Amino acid sequence: MLQSIAFIPDGNRRHASSEGISFTQSYVEGTRKAWDVLNWISKYPNIDTVIFYTLSLKNLERPKTELMILLKIFEQELDKVMKRNEVIENGINIKFIGRRDVFSKGFQTRMEKIEKYTDQFRNKQVIIAIGYDGQTEIVDAVKHYTAEFAQGKVNPGELTVNELQKYLYADFKSPDLIVRTSKEQRLSGFLTYQSAYSELAFLDKYWPEITEEDIDAVVADYENRHRRFGK
């Protein structure tokens, strides 16, 4: 049963090129599409966790002008989150994962306010990976664990896979299914620790182009799979 679904919303820039529109317009469309996806998924009551790979640490190495446009769009969207009916009506709890210190204080404050406001909601959880990299998350978790070891708070002999997971950026259900758009077939550092047994689906469309029918199709395909978890 599908409970946790994750998205790598790839292809915004290529969508802009193919449609002859600006990067700004394409990214705005991509942001709107994320809300569309949340609305489409709401008809599946068993799906209570949705994860978006919004911006990787590697993405921050893109040209400065493009980053300024992208972060401005994100800031504008963050300012609207607490006013959106979908958040309240669906009881969405929002968490951000990633290296927050790479963003401005104002951007960090926006994320903190959203997390604090939506902490009252528990029906569904939306995880937004921003300034994120899976390998970096593991390194940060190990650093956190070793710091506690140095203080005598933990016993390395008792360390398990589940125990180390407690030191990751946030506690949420590992994705049952990861969906990537734009024809690319790789995870690009997304949820490296949590995706060990995730099923994968790749859509031959750019992120702004996906439809409700595409979401229905990947959900139906998942339900027909038999997960063995390495057994």
Residue spans of the language-model regions?
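Flexible, compositionally biased loop and terminal segments
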Residues: M1-K231
